[in-house]
């Protein structure tokens, strides 16, 4: 009788220990990490022309400041799942399709140039912030456009599906500016619209505008002007209600930022020559970015 009780107790203890171990090590059922573990592949969304955040270089390799975060997160997933040979699949996304493709499971997360705001939080979750930007204008140097009021009655281009597009339409309506707003497919198309003379200015996040200027045939012909219409926080985007995966992403980002690694990434992409033309964006680390690196957070700024 005593032996039977002892055996039963040992079985119960063993089962409890096994469950506890499963809870500690195995990802929650239905989570992104569970999906990755079962499929043996992590699918990462990336941008094609968001210089210098996430874009193709001369060899069609995906590179950039945000891509460095993305790569660090992939390595953290491999370590978490104990899968050093985990297959990594990269798929290109746009401002228009990034949220639907995330929601339907086409990709698992993306680090690009996606603004974390309260409206988007209804559709997706965001990691700790990786970059802080201001929304301004790219225009021809020495031209008539110096600030947003100068856009009255003019053609202005903006990238479709972005927060800048929403802001520009709101400004046009509230200020009765009579602008003709052109919505382009991606940032590259937006700049080509500006370069061809079909628009007098390109409204977008200042760091992205600096990236488009760096890609131009004659970068010195273009300047970034105007009082910022908003301050925005870029975050890596993941599906809602997945605290385990968000924690992994946040921990990875915080480690990079507080250790000084993220500042090295910034210097590499914003203060040194970068592909495809080895041009230097000459973009300084802002006070907002310095504060972020000291105290990582996932706060939406708008």
Swiss-Prot record:
Keywords: Amino-acid transport, Periplasm, Signal, Transport. Residues 1-22 form the signal peptide. GO terms for biological process: amino acid transport. Its main location: periplasm. Pfam families: SBP_bac_3. Part of the ABC transporter complex GltIJKL involved in glutamate and aspartate uptake. Binds to both glutamate and aspartate. The complex is composed of two ATP-binding proteins (GltL), two transmembrane proteins (GltJ and GltK) and a solute-binding protein (GltI). Belongs to the bacterial solute-binding protein 3 family. This is Glutamate/aspartate import solute-binding protein. It comes from Salmonella typhimurium (strain LT2 / SGSC1412 / ATCC 700720). The lineage of its organism: Bacteria, Pseudomonadati, Pseudomonadota, Gammaproteobacteria, Enterobacterales. The gene is gltI.
């Amino acid at each position: 009788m005593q032996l039977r009780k002892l055996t039963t107790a040992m079985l119960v203890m063993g089962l409890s220990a096994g469950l506890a171990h499963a809870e500690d090590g195995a990802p929650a059922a239905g989570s992104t990490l569970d999906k990755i573990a079962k499929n043996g592949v992590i699918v990462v969304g990336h941008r094609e022309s968001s210089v210098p955040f996430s874009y193709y270089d001369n060899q069609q390799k995906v590179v950039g400041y945000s891509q460095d975060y993305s790569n660090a997160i992939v390595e953290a997933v491999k370590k978490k799942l104990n899968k050093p040979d985990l297959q990594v699949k990269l798929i290109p996304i746009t401002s228009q399709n990034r949220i639907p493709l995330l929601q339907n499971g086409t990709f698992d997360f993306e680090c690009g140039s996606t603004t974390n705001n309260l409206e988007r939080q209804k559709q997706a979750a965001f990691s700790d912030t990786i970059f802080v930007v201001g929304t301004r204008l790219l225009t021809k140097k020495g031209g008539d456009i110096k600030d947003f009021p100068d856009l009255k009655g003019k053609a202005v281009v903006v990238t479709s599906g972005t927060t800048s597009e929403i802001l520009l339409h709101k400004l046009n309506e509230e200020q009765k500016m009579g602008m003709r707003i052109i919505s382009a497919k991606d940032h590259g198309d937006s700049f080509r619209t500006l370069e061809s003379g079909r628009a007098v200015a390109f409204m977008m996040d200042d760091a992205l505008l600096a990236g488009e200027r760096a890609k131009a045939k004659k970068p010195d012909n273009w300047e970034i002007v105007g009082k910022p219409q908003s301050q925005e926080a870029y975050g890596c985007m993941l599906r809602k209600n997945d605290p385990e995966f968000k924690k992994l992403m946040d921990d990875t980002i915080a480690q990079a930022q507080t250790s000084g690694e993220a500042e090295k990434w910034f210097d590499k992409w914003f203060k040194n020559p970068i592909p495809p033309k080895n041009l230097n964006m000459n973009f300084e680390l802002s006070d907002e970015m310095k504060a972020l690196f000291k105290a990582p957070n996932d706060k939406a700024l708008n």
